[in-house]
């Protein structure tokens, strides 16, 4: 080991980890937690600092605990005794003991110094106190277990005192010291259990007697005596220190767990954590409670809470990725490519909606993609290849609509160079900034194409200045980004753009190995009639061939067909080439990595085990809600949901729609997506919608068949289909708005000032008023205002003019009125009449 952890030093010294950590920080060592490590040299300095300073006062009491330690530390001491015996028989003990001391310091950083201190104190203070019978056996036990480390410190300190006595006593002293040192573990807890220790005084007297008896005996015999003595010692001490032994056991187990590194999955419950660290669930819950967290044994613990608990229980945790052993991509990448050749660059075209991305690509490859997209807006990602001067370039076209954020992010991750298209007549827009951020996040080089340069209102300088504000400065202004002015309509500047792309690709030295199995990234996926699940991929490395066994996340299969960007069936795709793969068992999520493996069994193993993990993870998610949330949900009519079933033609569109609809919510209403899938609207979707109250089926680029329509009509299920995402989102907004409670606004209709009051027996107080503003209406709501303060809010129960009932009195006229349930009207009060107007709420 290169380093020693703070908690290890603490366990050796018998102190708490936090105390040692504090001392280390006082010394200026860079440590943050008990798990932090320090070098051996720093550990020695830290030990000396603790012992020679504040530890001196504590030294006397820790010594008292040796009694307990004797029974527990049998194994290690025996080995040490053998070493000592050999050393003693060999030659001069004093000279050999000193070098041993140095070695011991290296091996167990702090014990030697501690032991020295304890030895001294015990010899001085403990001799006068005697408890003869019990202590004899104790002495026997501890004497034989002398370690080289322990003897040395004692001899050094006791030389002067023992010189006065006979030579043999010197060895006895060593024996005594060893006893004390041997019980080091007990004294580890010195600070907490000082009051409990009462047996130590017996040791010193009895030790001397035992040592004198054992003096002539061979070291090997001592070993035997150790075993016997320990047994008797344990038996005799049972009545006296049983509780202490229990505590000691706990401490020993604690020191073991301190060294433990516990591996935990990302998702772990309280009881699972307790099992892993060897504690009871109650202990863990108690600690959580003390930290202010209420938890049951089935609750999940987040990473932050796990770190806090690890600190509390002095364990080191390591979060392991359960999928690591199922990471087929990692296995693929582990094989180094021994052969590399140049590959075409993969270019992603990104930018704001309607800025001409697809039109630009359309001009480059001379097709009419934009006309086929609903509303001329790109709804799907397309991947295409073109040739320029004998060199090929792969293009990915991403949608610019705000709902397709994730699709743009995937495009950025799968690409080598990003083309940011900005309209010269429109400037930088929100999705332009977002596209720039995606490219920066993916660490992809950017080229800016200023489109629509042919328009009279085009202002390329404005675009440059706007982009410079967000850190995209053109090279002509001293920046590092290439700006190319183009027109997708006339073709102006398109060749310059392609040349710039090829130049950038040449600088990047893009290479791959076409002579190995394929690795590809899924750009788009869908469920097609007659073909089943299909995935549009771009090969990143290797060659993808028809017949290959592939795994793609939780999907697997055999490549039955590959279709290129022109719709032709082909046999293989090489690095940077796009293709549509047919043959997977399910629709893979966009952005997933597809890898060719050696056989169907391996592909199935990866996919099925990953699918099982995902299923377990989904099932294990807690559904617990807080009391506050629960009380809010229980309030009548508080939260209204619009249950919807979404079906789309592609995975990317489905994700975009789900993301947009989940944002349509407030504290009163929200969209509840009860099912979402790729493919046509089926009868099972209609059945599910019927089972869910007021559910609506939303289809995007898919339509129901005749049988499905008929069933929906019979069950009264509403099916809405769309081809443009704007329309779908707007319709859902309208549906949600209809569920919102109307907004009630007050409208003041008039004011009247009380000029006189009349008390009418059995009726109440009538206020004679002059209307000063607006109109006073009978049965209108009214509030009585006195000195600017509202003192009553009710309604006008009676309104008369010249003793006749009237419906309303306008400004400038006098009237008599009564306020319902209020007779304390006084001259000078103001009556304010108002009505409540309901307005439809909108999201």
Curated annotation (Swiss-Prot):
Residues 114-128, 156-165 have a biased composition (Basic residues). GO terms for molecular function: GTP binding; GTPase activity; translation initiation factor activity. Residues 451-454 are annotated as: G4. One of its GO terms (cellular component) is cytosol. The keyword GTP-binding applies. Residues 487-489 are annotated as: G5. Keywords: Cytoplasm, GTP-binding, Initiation factor, Nucleotide-binding, Protein biosynthesis. Residues 351-358 are annotated as: G1. Residues 397-400 are annotated as: G3. Its main location: cytoplasm. One of the essential components for the initiation of protein synthesis. Protects formylmethionyl-tRNA from spontaneous hydrolysis and promotes its binding to the 30S ribosomal subunits. Also involved in the hydrolysis of GTP during the formation of the 70S ribosomal complex. This is Translation initiation factor IF-2.
């Amino acid at each position: 080991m290169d380093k020693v952890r703070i908690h290890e030093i603490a366990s050796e010294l018998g102190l708490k980890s936090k105390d040692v950590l504090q001392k280390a920080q006082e010394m200026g060592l860079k440590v943050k937690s008990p798990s932090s490590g320090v070098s051996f040299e720093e550990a020695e300095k830290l030990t000396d600092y603790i012992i020679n300073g504040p530890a001196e006062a504590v030294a006397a009491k820790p010594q008292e605990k040796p009694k307990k330690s004797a029974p527990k530390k049998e194994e290690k001491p025996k080995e040490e005794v053998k070493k000592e015996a050999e050393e003693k028989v060999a030659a001069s003990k004093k000279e050999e003991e000193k070098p041993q001391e140095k070695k011991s310091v290296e091996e167990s950083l702090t014990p030697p110094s501690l032991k020295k201190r304890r030895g001294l104190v015990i010899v001085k203070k403990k001799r006068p106190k005697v408890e003869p019978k019990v202590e004899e056996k104790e002495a026997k036990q501890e004497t034989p277990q002398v370690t080289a480390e322990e003897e040395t410190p004692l001899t050094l300190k006791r030389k002067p005192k023992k010189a006065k006595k006979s030579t043999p006593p010197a060895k006895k002293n060593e024996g005594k010291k060893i006893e004390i040192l041997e019980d080091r573990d007990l004294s580890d807890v010195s600070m907490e259990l000082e009051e409990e220790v009462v047996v130590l005084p017996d040791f010193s007297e009895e030790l001397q007697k035992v040592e004198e008896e054992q003096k002539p005996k061979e070291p090997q015999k001592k070993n035997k005596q150790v075993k016997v003595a320990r047994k008797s010692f344990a038996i005799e001490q049972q009545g006296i220190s049983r509780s202490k032994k229990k505590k000691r056991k706990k401490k020993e187990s604690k020191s073991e767990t301190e060294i433990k590194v516990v591996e935990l999955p990302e998702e772990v419950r309280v009881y699972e954590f307790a099992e892993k660290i060897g504690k009871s669930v109650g202990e863990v819950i108690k600690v959580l409670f003390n930290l202010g967290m209420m938890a049951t044994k089935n609750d999940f613990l987040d990473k932050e809470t796990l770190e806090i608990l690890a600190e509390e229980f002095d364990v080191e945790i390591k979060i392991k990725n359960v999928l690591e052993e199922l990471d087929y991509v990692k296995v693929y990448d582990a094989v180094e490519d021994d052969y590399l050749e140049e590959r075409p660059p993969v270019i992603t075209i990104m930018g704001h909606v309607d800025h001409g991305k697809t039109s630009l690509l359309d001009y480059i490859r001379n097709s009419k993609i934009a006309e086929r997209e609903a509303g001329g807006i790109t709804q799907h990602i397309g991947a295409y290849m073109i040739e320029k001067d004998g060199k090929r370039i792969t293009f990915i076209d991403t949608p610019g609509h705000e709902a397709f954020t994730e699709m743009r992010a995937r495009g950025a991750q799968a690409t080598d160079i990003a083309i940011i298209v900005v309209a010269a007549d429109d400037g930088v827009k929100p999705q332009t900034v977002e596209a720039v951020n995606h490219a920066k996040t993916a660490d992809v080089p950017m080229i800016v194409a200023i489109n629509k340069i042919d328009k009279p209102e085009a202002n390329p300088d404005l675009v440059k200045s706007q982009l410079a504000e967000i850190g995209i400065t053109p090279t002509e202004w001293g920046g590092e980004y290439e700006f190319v002015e183009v027109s997708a309509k006339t073709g102006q500047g398109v060749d310059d753009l392609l040349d710039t792309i090829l130049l950038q690709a040449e600088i990047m030295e893009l290479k791959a190995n076409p002579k190995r199995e394929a690795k590809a990234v899924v750009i788009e996926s869908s469920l097609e009639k007659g073909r089943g699940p299909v995935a549009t991929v771009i090969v990143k490395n290797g060659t993808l061939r028809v017949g290959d066994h592939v795994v793609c996340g939780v999907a697997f299969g055999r490549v039955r067909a590959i279709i290129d960007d022109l719709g032709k069936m082909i046999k293989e795709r090489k690095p940077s080439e796009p293709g549509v793969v047919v043959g997977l068992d399910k629709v893979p999520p966009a952005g997933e990595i597809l890898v060719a493996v050696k056989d169907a069994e391996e592909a199935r193993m990866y996919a099925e085990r990953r699918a099982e993990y995902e299923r377990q993870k989904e099932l294990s998610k807690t559904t617990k809600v807080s009391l506050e949330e629960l009380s809010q949900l229980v309030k009548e009519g508080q939260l209204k949901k619009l249950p919807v079933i979404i079906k789309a033609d592609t995975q990317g569109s489905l994700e975009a729609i789900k993301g947009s609809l989940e944002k349509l919510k407030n504290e009163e209403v929200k969209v509840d997506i009860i099912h979402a899938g790729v493919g046509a609207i089926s009868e099972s979707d209609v059945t599910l919608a019927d089972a869910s109250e007021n559910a609506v089926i939303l289809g995007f680029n898919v339509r129901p068949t005749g049988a499905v329509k008929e069933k929906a009509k019979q069950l009264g299920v509403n099916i809405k289909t769309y081809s443009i995402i704007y329309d779908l989102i707007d319709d859902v907004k309208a549906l949600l708005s209809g569920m919102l409670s109307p907004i009630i606004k007050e409208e003041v209709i008039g004011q009247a000032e009380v000029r006189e009051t009349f008390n009418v027996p059995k009726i109440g107080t009538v206020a004679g008023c002059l209307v000063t503003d607006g109109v006073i209406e009978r049965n209108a709501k009214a509030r009585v205002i006195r000195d600017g303060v509202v003192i009553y809010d009710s309604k006008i129960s009676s309104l008369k003019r010249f003793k006749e009932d009237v419906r309303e009195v306008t400004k400038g006229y006098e009237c008599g009125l009564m306020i319902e349930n209020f007779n304390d009207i006084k001259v000078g009060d103001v009556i304010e009449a108002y009505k409540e107007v309901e307005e439809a709420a909108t999201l």
